[in-house]
């Protein structure tokens, strides 16, 4: 259903790099400018948090435990995302970019320890949208989220 581990991890690195380049090239005054519901700063905090909890969620799945954040899935993770904005309040772009990198690197280092045989293993946990919740599915969520939010910034500010 999903790509093999190394392909997905390569895709994650690609979309992460593109997102980071967009944030680095963004004019400083636009980092805190509104995109409607949030700002590029908020999106950066969002990724610091999601990199961290994706690692935890993958670890929980390996133990056959539902990831703690699934409770908020039908709410589009609004409670989880709001918590990240409070938990990571910095408005310093360089600090947040560094934290995204540190948390992404920790996630990828952990994911590289997972055998391919466990990548799409069904441990009995069902994703709130149906079908098995797997490590591959968790990684796929990030692989789709980075470009989605990058495009949101590009659409608002025409930067690239």
Locations of regions flagged by a protein language model:
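Extreme N-terminal tail/first-helix region
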Residues: 1-17
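Acidic/histidine-rich alpha-helical segments that form the ligand environment
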Residues: 79-120
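Active-site rim elements
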Residues: 2-6, 91-97, 138-139
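Structural signal for well-ordered, non-membrane alpha-helices
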Residues: 16-24, 51-55, 59, 101-115, ...
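A short, compositionally biased N-terminal segment around positions ~18-40 that is enriched
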Residues: 21-33
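Short hydrophobic/aromatic segments of transmembrane alpha-helices and their interfaces
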Residues: 13, 23-26, 131-132
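Short, contiguous alpha-helical
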Residues: 9-10, 30-79, 120-160
């Amino acid at each position: 259903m999903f790509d093999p581990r190394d392909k997905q991890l390569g895709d994650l690195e690609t979309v992460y790099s593109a997102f980071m380049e967009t944030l680095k090239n963004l004019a400083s005054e636009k980092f805190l400018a509104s995109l409607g519901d949030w700002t590029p700063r908020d999106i950066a905090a969002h990724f610091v948090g999601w990199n961290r909890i994706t690692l935890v969620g993958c670890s929980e799945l390996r133990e056959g435990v539902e990831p703690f954040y699934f409770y908020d899935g039908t709410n589009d993770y609004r409670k989880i995302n709001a918590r990240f904005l409070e938990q990571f309040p910095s408005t310093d772009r360089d600090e947040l970019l560094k934290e995204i990198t540190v948390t992404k690197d920790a996630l990828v280092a952990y994911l590289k320890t997972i055998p391919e045989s466990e990548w799409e293993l069904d441990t009995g946990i069902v994703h709130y949208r149906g079908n098995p919740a797997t490590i591959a599915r968790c990684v796929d969520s990030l692989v789709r989220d980075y470009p989605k939010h990058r495009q949101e910034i590009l659409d608002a500010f025409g930067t690239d």
